[in-house]
Structure formats: C-alpha cells, structure tokens
Amino acid sequence: MRLVLDAMGGDHAPAAPVEGGVLFARAHPGHEVLLVGDEAKVAPLLGKLRPPSNLQVHHASEVVEMDEHASTAFRRKRDSSLRVGFELVRDGRAEALVSAGNSGAVMAGGLLTLGRLPGVERPAIAALFPALKGGGRCLLLDAGANVDCKPTHLAQFAVMGEAYVRARMGVARPRVAVLSNGEESSKGTPLTREASGLLRRSDLDFVGYVEGKDLFSGEVQVVVTDGFTGNVVLKTSEGVGMGVIGMLRQAIERRGGLAEKVGAMLLQPALAGLRRVVDYAEYGGAPLLGIQGVGIVAHGRSTPRALFNALGAALAMAEGGVQAELTRCIGRAAAWLPTHPKGKRATDAGVSD
C-alpha cells in the first residue's frame, strides 16, 4: 500500500508530518509513505532523519492554511499539498490520504476530488471515544464535517458508522443511538426526533436517544449528531480528560507530603495508562466516511506519534474492506431512507466554507 501524508498540514508542519512519516515507513517496510509538500522545506528535515527507501517526497508548492475558507482555497490552490495528495489517491497512485491540516479543506477535497460513495449525501467525520466498560470504543459522527444537517443525513451517518464499527472494529451487532438532551423520546429537536423516526424503520440495532455521558458507558457503539454538536462534544471531552489528569497532579503536588509523593509514584503507571486512553494522539485520526477513497482527518496539533497512528488507521481501513461494506450498507438503506439528491448540485451542497 502507498499512503499519502500531507507534509504541510497541521500546527507543527512540516516537522511533525516528516518525522511521523519516517517513523511509520521504518516500522512498515512493506508499505510506502509519500510525503506531499514543499520539497525545499521537507528535504532538509529528512536529511537529519535518514529516511528509509520506502519514503518518498512528492513536491507541491502551495498550502491550504488553517484560517482560509476551505472549499475556496482548495479550488483556487491547484498545487496545494492537500489537493495534489487527493489527486494521487483519485488517480490510483496511492490508496489513502492523511492530513492534519484544515479539516474543512479535507472534507472539500474528499468530495470534489474523490466524490461520494453511491447514495451518500454528506460524508461525515467519525471520531472514537474510549468506553469505560470492557475497554471498547464508541464512534461519534459527525464530529465536524457538516454544521447543518437534515434527518436523512443523521440516518446515513448511523448506517455508515454501524458498517464501520462492524468492519473495522469487529463488533457483530453495534448498538446505534442519536445524541440528545435526554433519553425520553419527547426530548430533542425536530432534527433528532425525525432522524430517530427514520432509524426506527431501519434494520439497525437502534436504541433511541442517549445523553453525552453515554458516549463513555460502553452501552452503545455508534452515536450520531450534527457536525456542530459533535465537534463541540469532541473538543470538550478532550479538554475534560486532560484537565482531570492535570488537576489530580496539582492536588498531589499541593499536599507535597511524603505520603502523597509515595502515592503519586504508585499511581504513575495508572495515570500513564489513563493519559493514553484520553490522548488524541493514540487514536491518530478520524476517518472521513462516505467518500470514494480513504481520507483520515488528524488533529491540527498532531505530534509525530499521532501522525504515525493516523497512518496506521489509514492502512487498516484501506486493507480492511471497509469501503465495500459502506457501499453495500448504504445501498441496502435505500429501502427505508428517502431519495437522496444526485449530481453536481448535491456535491456542492456538501461543500461549504
């Protein structure tokens, strides 16, 4: 497999992508990493790292910046690292793309360059949350690709999320829910109530509404919401997880006695394990489900380790038959979902700034 890594995407680019790509190439000699970016900036960094032969550089002279309008910049910057990378996937010269750059531009690039899977109206970013029960995971989508959603979008997110969890995570019968402000069917908004009505007609194991706390319970494996809410939940959870660890450390340091210091030493392995559970770097990146190809959206602050793991997620998805399962399940869902718009206007509707 050949994997594209956007060398210019992210807060720590190009240093973090270059180092992450080198680490992955060394660990996976049977696969190739293609760093796409400004060769004049990438080459000096590679010279210090002595990269293996299965890592190559593909020059791209432009960058879609984090503060630019996503679709406008992607269309205008024809030689951007993100656009060139997606074109390599489209042309069959690579099997997947990973980027820690502008997530809106990744969404735009996936739609405009690769297109949607048949029947998909809006792709979605799917983010994994750690579960307290059984060491499992919960998949939340959309985690930021679509601010405004229709009920059919949420229903499709559920279909894609359920298929992904089965194919990628090996859960035989994932439990699916809609995120709301209470478990009662009378709660929620017109969007969540209508989406729930659609999902009750499906063959999914739909359990109704769940609250935010249930993302971590292990009782459900797929939770759907609009991209605005999902992104707020994702970033809040990230902050809470790291904040709890920080507050615990501060409490121990403030006490400062011998007992506290001994206790801190004994707790160190547990704290390190907890940090790994809540650290986004361990998950690498979130797949963009619903495009005709594999695209992984990595955190903007991704470290080399995070990008190493994101490349691992891309490889596993490309090798695991996930795309075929997504296509099959979306096709089956046409029996109970309303007709989706087709053609260029539908694609443009899914791409915004």
Swiss-Prot record:
Q: Which domain of life is it from?
A: Bacteria
**Record Pfam families:** FA_synthesis (PF02504)
InterPro entries, sorted: FA_synthesis, Phospholipid_synth_PlsX-like
Quaternary form?
Homodimer. Probably interacts with PlsY.
Query: What are its GO biological-process terms?
Result: fatty acid biosynthetic process; phospholipid biosynthetic process
**What keywords is this UniProt entry annotated with?**
Cytoplasm, Lipid biosynthesis, Lipid metabolism, Phospholipid biosynthesis, Phospholipid metabolism, Transferase
Compartments reported by the entry: Cytoplasm
Give the function comment from the record.
Catalyzes the reversible formation of acyl-phosphate (acyl-PO(4)) from acyl-[acyl-carrier-protein] (acyl-ACP). This enzyme utilizes acyl-ACP as fatty acyl donor, but not acyl-CoA.
Catalytic activity, EC: 2.3.1.274
What's a single GO CC term here? cytoplasm
Q: Which family does it belong to?
A: Belongs to the PlsX family.
Provide the catalytic activity annotation.
a fatty acyl-[ACP] + phosphate = an acyl phosphate + holo-[ACP]
A GO MF annotation of the entry reads:
phosphate:acyl-[acyl carrier protein] acyltransferase activity
Question: Under what name is this protein listed?
Answer: Phosphate acyltransferase
Listed pathway(s): Lipid metabolism; phospholipid metabolism
